[in-house]
Amino acid sequence: MRRLRAVPVALTVVAVASAVCALSLGTPYVPPARLPATLGSDGLAGIVVTELRLPRLVLALVAGACLGAAGLVLQEALRNPLAVPEMLGVSSGAALGVAAPLVLALSLPLGLQPFLALAGAAFGGLLTLVAAGFGRSPSSVLLTGAAVAAALQAGLLVLMVMADQLDLQLIYRYLLGSLSARTWDDVTGLLPWLAVALPALVLCVPVLGVLRLGDDDARALGVRVERARVAALGIAVVLIAPVVAVCGPVAWVGFLAPHLARRLKPDGGAAGWLVRSALCGAVVVLCADQPARLALAPVETPVGAWTALVGVPVGVVLLKRGRRAARRSDRGPAPAGPASDASLSVPGRATEPVRGAEPVPLLRKAER
């Protein structure tokens, strides 16, 4: 119990330390004690912290929370811990929707990028559901989604071959996910999408709790399973598409954050896991952005490379531990000995001795 209580405290400490590092470290360096006075000042340090580092910090938290919540919605709706946006064609479709106009030299305003990402993500997700029979089998949806994601990534490779050198560098950097050079305009561009997604998440939580019981039990309780899965996919698309439009596909946050949330409180339920998954996703992206910004300074590395580098092995370890714990709980306590066998015997029938076992004392006296 103490260990479970210490984990949220540790996450809070890590988040605060990462936030201080995000605002202090870099060029110019700002000591943590001077951060309150530096925010909003007219000097060089104040402009860098207020206009560059602080919006990047807020964007990392918002993007991570959206990806973590979307990952949990997909995993709960499909009842599969491997259901992630990268495996269902959602992230690849959103990236394709943003990259295609750039390569085709279409002059479109920047405000349309979230809508292009939304259209691409919806196309990839709906293509997965249509090919899998509208979610009749969670395993078939996952396998079909992997095939659709591979096809969309092949389309991205074709676009990269068609692009010139400058566009190729932009697309390559975009596909790895980056928070570099993001401003307050990028942060405010996510707010309308959050205003749509948050009420939908609140309405979706009870349905996710029912879907955990299985398709037959959910139908018996009045839930239309296929429509519920389509709605869950739509909510995940609304959460993922604007993040991909602004930051690119930040990989495997939707895989790691739900497993961390379940690890923190295994019996939390869909509502508790959703909040914890969003918080864990925000902390993961914020922590991953620090080595992305500072490891090879002054050159920045994509944050998506660090989330994939850390998220995949940690998520696999958490997944294995969760399965082991589930197996132990399913086995239950072992029988206490001959007394438990006697309690299971049917009255009126003689109990035959088990072969290879030592006879009980009453049988020994009868043999004498």
Segment roles from a protein language model:
Residues M1-G348, V354-R368:
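Alpha-helical transmembrane segments in inner-membrane proteins
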